[in-house]
Amino acid sequence: MMVAWWSLFLYGLQVAAPALAATPADWRSQSIYFLLTDRFARTDGSTTATCNTADQKYCGGTWQGIIDKLDYIQGMGFTAIWITPVTAQLPQTTAYGDAYHGYWQQDIYSLNENYGTADDLKALSSALHERGMYLMVDVVANHMGYDGAGSSVDYSVFKPFSSQDYFHPFCFIQNYEDQTQVEDCWLGDNTVSLPDLDTTKDVVKNEWYDWVGSLVSNYSIDGLRIDTVKHVQKDFWPGYNKAAGVYCIGEVLDVDPAYTCPYQNVMDGVLNYPIYYPLLNAFKSTSGSMDDLYNMINTVKSDCPDSTLLGTFVENHDNPRFASYTNDIALAKNVAAFIILNDGIPIIYAGQEQHYAGGNDPANREATWLSGYPTDSELYKLIASANAIRNYAISKDTGFVTYKNWPIYKDDTTIAMRKGTDGSQIVTILSNKGASGDSYTLSLSGAGYTAGQQLTEVIGCTTVTVGSDGNVPVPMAGGLPRVLYPTEKLAGSKICSSS
């Protein structure tokens, strides 16, 4: 059986991973596969079990199911997974369906039995650690979940926050420009309300700090993704991050870096929403503009406390799938390459590698098992190749993850960027011409390579030679991304059979 070069490389690199740690510095070099536990894999291994996203019901995904599919995840070069919240949820089937997603918790000291047992969750952590991989768990400190109107909540159902005294007085957020409302009023509506915990109270604050430390310890968790961060006052978060004792990355759902970046002063990292829309808009059509993306790369790099600790993404369970905008596979390849080779920690959402095309929630929460988990799909292979060169560059260049990505070229349809110290840099050229894009040679300056140096394009496994003027003649065709790395540095790596 023929085995792809990237599979051999990734296996060799990851089984040799060093002892696990969970500091922000360690997380810089990770690559995250994000999944909804209920929608990724079932214990019975079924690839045909029905999962109608419109029903918004539990579909049967489990922690054991994830364990059984770690080869599939690791085969793409991912070094970590992020799973949705593990706490016990409201038990009812509401008018909006079940709490299969995990964001309507009612008992923070019990686990969601739909996903499995405490032993199953511990087994998942152990299985990841045996592979040199990390476990990131989603957590919610802002709110609980209630099946009913905000004005008639039975607070006794919440554990341990079993009285109204623990919560902000009921009011729904009316004005998102008013930060006081954003923090003190409630999310949800009168069908499913999300009672808002008053995290300014010491009793609430201390409960959360004790809880998060215990959660991390009990299940050997390596990192946390924190939901609805902007809905909690900033001075709550440093203590929470410290109590967790691991890298914390927060969801601050706002596109303005002037609003989002300061949250990095109160926790380790945030999801890179400022770059999300420029990235999406650059590649969701063949008429997208590279200008906003080029400018936002530089803005985030200069304005955020540390862009190398942000999470880069273009898909998640809250936003429409990239393929819901366009079915052009070349555009999807470019956006995936950007995610993996930009500054920060790459995040690919389960199903993205199979070109899933669900629109707004709940359509974007498809069951991954219905794809059959093919490892020969075009995006699976592209993601594996991009992760492979990133992982390899990190292993060879201690400064790679802290070297800030530098856009070196743009035109109406192209952006090029370099990352890594001189002599070991990756240069990525991205196009939005799409699959019908013409063939041409781009003369690229500013890449930092030397005249006559041979480079390997690691997606297509071809080579190019740097011109006498230092420019790189990059052959472009079919709107595909190009990723360059010095050929001599690949010796022994198995990447492109070491060229």
Curated annotation (Swiss-Prot):
This enzyme's EC code(s): 3.2.1.1
UniProt-listed Pfam families: A_amylase_dom_C (PF09260), Alpha-amylase (PF00128)
Recorded GO CC terms: extracellular region
Gene it is expressed from: amy
Binding positions for substrate per the UniProt entry: Q56, W104, H143, R225, K230, H231, D318, R365
GO terms for MF: alpha-amylase activity; calcium ion binding
Needed co-factor(s): Ca(2+)
Binding residues annotated for Ca(2+) 1, in chain numbering: N142, E183, D196, H231
Position of the signal peptide: 1-21
GO biological process: carbohydrate catabolic process
Main EC class the enzyme belongs to: hydrolase
Family label: Belongs to the glycosyl hydrolase 13 family.
Residues with attached carbohydrate: N218
Taxonomic source organism: Aspergillus usamii
Location of this chain's protein in the cell: Secreted
CDD domains in alphabetical order: AmyAc_euk_AmyA
Cofactor binding summary note: Binds 2 calcium ions per subunit. Calcium is inhibitory at high concentrations.
UniProt name for this protein: Alpha-amylase
Annotated InterPro entries: A-amylase-like (IPR013777), A_amylase_C_dom (IPR015340), Alpha_amylase (IPR006046), Glyco_hydro_13_cat_dom (IPR006047), Glyco_hydro_b (IPR013780), Glycoside_hydrolase_SF (IPR017853)
UniProt-annotated site: Transition state stabilizer, residues: D318
Active-site feature positions: D227, E251
Residues reported to bind Ca(2+) 2: D227, E251
Record carries keyword Lyase: no
Disulfide topology: C51-C59, C171-C185, C261-C304, C461-C496
Record key words, sorted: Calcium, Carbohydrate metabolism, Disulfide bond, Glycoprotein, Glycosidase, Hydrolase, Metal-binding, Secreted, Signal
Reactions the enzyme catalyzes: Endohydrolysis of (1->4)-alpha-D-glucosidic linkages in polysaccharides containing three or more (1->4)-alpha-linked D-glucose units
